[in-house]
């Protein structure tokens, strides 16, 4: 019987164990995932049409009859989100001056505040008008429902600007500071149209949750869910 050195025998044993595990792994059926890996998704993104309503509330499987909010657009907003595509989400759409923010809901002007910025306005707000903007954000942080919406992608915000006075890193990190320091959430949308849908849905849902809470239904859309 041939004699092998201990190191060689150990390597042979490890190789045999690895081959055994490989055979077992191949014999076991693989579980199919319901959602494929994001790497397999198409890189071409085409947003689908918005829903008839963002969400509905139900209790015991029966949809509740809930009122629609009245959206408010600040009259000083430049290139405003008109919400024309989402008129069925609101009882009415008003244009009048707001003391804070660009968008709100009637009856919740002091508790629901949405500030919108396109890329150029965001850069100017974090540079030339930084003190004014930070003070506005501090006031927003005191509101129960506040949201900063940027109608530009994070890639655009992080990319080089045509003017050297503004630093993409400083703008990006200022956004993170707004979230971490002031606890004001922000969301970036690639287009003006997507921003319009996000803001419209936020106003609708903020009003709906508030109505459910005030009328003894609790802050959830359906039993055991959001």
Explain the meaning of each model-derived region.
Residues 23-110, 121-226:
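Non-catalytic C-terminal interaction segments of nucleic acid-processing enzymes
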Residues 112-118:
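Conserved catalytic cores of phosphodiester-cleaving nucleases, focusing on short active-site segments
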């Amino acid at each position: 019987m041939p004699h092998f050195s201990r190191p060689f025998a150990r390597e042979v044993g490890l190789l045999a164990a690895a081959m055994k595990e490989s055979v077992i792994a191949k014999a076991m059926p693989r579980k199919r995932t319901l959602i494929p890996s994001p790497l397999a998704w198409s890189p071409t993104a085409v947003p689908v049409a918005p829903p008839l309503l963002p969400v509905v509330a139900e209790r015991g499987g029966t949809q509740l009859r809930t009122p629609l909010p009245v959206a408010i657009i600040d009259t000083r907003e430049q290139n405003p989100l008109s919400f024309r595509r989402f008129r069925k989400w609101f009882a009415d759409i008003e244009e009048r001056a707001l003391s804070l923010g660009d968008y709100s809901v009637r009856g919740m002007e002091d508790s629901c505040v949405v500030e919108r910025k396109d890329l150029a306005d965001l850069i100017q707000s974090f540079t030339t008008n930084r003190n004014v903007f930070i003070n506005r954000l501090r006031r927003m942080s005191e509101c129960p429902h506040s949201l900063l919406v940027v109608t530009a992608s994070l890639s655009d915000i992080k990319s080089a600007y045509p003017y050297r006075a503004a630093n993409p890193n400083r703008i990006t990190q200022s956004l993170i500071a707004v979230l971490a320091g002031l606890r004001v959430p922000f969301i970036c949308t690639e287009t003006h149209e997507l921003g319009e849908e996000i803001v419209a849905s936020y106003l609708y849902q903020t009003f709906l949750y508030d109505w459910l809470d005030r009328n003894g239904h609790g802050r959830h859309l359906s039993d055991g869910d959001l």
